[in-house]
Amino acid sequence: MFRTKRSALVRRLWRSRAPGGEDEEEGAGGGGGGGELRGEGATDSRAHGAGGGGPGRAGCCLGKAVRGAKGHHHPHPPAAGAGAAGGAEADLKALTHSVLKKLKERQLELLLQAVESRGGTRTACLLLPGRLDCRLGPGAPAGAQPAQPPSSYSLPLLLCKVFRWPDLRHSSEVKRLCCCESYGKINPELVCCNPHHLSRLCELESPPPPYSRYPMDFLKPTADCPDAVPSSAETGGTNYLAPGGLSDSQLLLEPGDRSHWCVVAYWEEKTRVGRLYCVQEPSLDIFYDLPQGNGFCLGQLNSDNKSQLVQKVRSKIGCGIQLTREVDGVWVYNRSSYPIFIKSATLDNPDSRTLLVHKVFPGFSIKAFDYEKAYSLQRPNDHEFMQQPWTGFTVQISFVKGWGQCYTRQFISSCPCWLEVIFNSR
């Protein structure tokens, strides 16, 4: 019997599904193929791993590094055994095949291209009806029923669960990327189902309380931290001073054109490599090696650093990160195959004297900077504050290697490859 191209594409897609459970690579998203899959309007039933963490949470150097990789939670009670897990896998396979068999050949090819590229290549949107009838396809076992009886499934959620994060349970755990046609649209008739046009959301382990007007002293450079160089020194003249209050004219990045909303500096240990990169477009890819890459290519910068560790980390940057300015702030999406580490004044408790370093796994997004919170952290009437650079509009990002209290590196200037992102006022 001859096999059609469509059936071959379906089998190839199923073989490309994300591994689950113990087979999963670190940071890729796991937790087994079973479990409930709720639609957009269903109640949130996220399962959290041991230690109070969850698959969508961001680990930090002072807390538990909760991984979206290893599936420590169990969709079924342990007493259910392998039989229940196998049944859930069979249900998922039957449902996925019933969906894929309804797609046109061109749609299958587009989906396969996105899945096999793992997000490294820009792929088109896969526009499909957003919801799917919950009844299983003809390949389902006799009498098989879904684990939960919602009226319909979210199709983007199903494809993300199959091809990216097997432990995914609810639409509130993912965020659509701004490059997608469905970004910002509410309940469109057709929605993009390309699994690499969505990212997994990082949740802080404990949300910060309301921000006070006159908060923390740790935003000032301190004499007892010689390696914690303030941003004005690190970026060669970039300065943030706020004498007498807040205004656009007082928060300057560099003289001249103010059309850019941030500048990016790339560092290898204590040495800045290349020039400052001014960002004007709403979205910027920062990468070392990216097929069809368009943005800030770190691989093209001339570096004299011969350290084996620096060269090793540099080779792991790969697709890097995506920096996006959106309505609610600035988001960072980890496109690489390794974790990144982020420190930002707007991510943490303003009453703390130490900023946490947040670990962001591959495929995850985090809102790294919030303009309104940054404004509230300034002290315009503080005479001492007026005399020193203020670093609240700066975010630091390290590739692969972390720093802070739980690491041998106490300061980011000891990290092999890292970025300093300095934001303009809007």
From Swiss-Prot:
This is Mothers against decapentaplegic homolog 7. There is a cross-link at residues 64, 70 (Glycyl lysine isopeptide (Lys-Gly) (interchain with G-Cter in ubiquitin)). Zn(2+) binds at residues 125, 180, 192, 197. Induction: By TGFB1. Residues 261-426 form the MH2 domain. Residues 13-55 are annotated as: Disordered. Changing residue 64 to A: Loss of acetylation, and of SMURF1-dependent degradation. The gene is SMAD7.
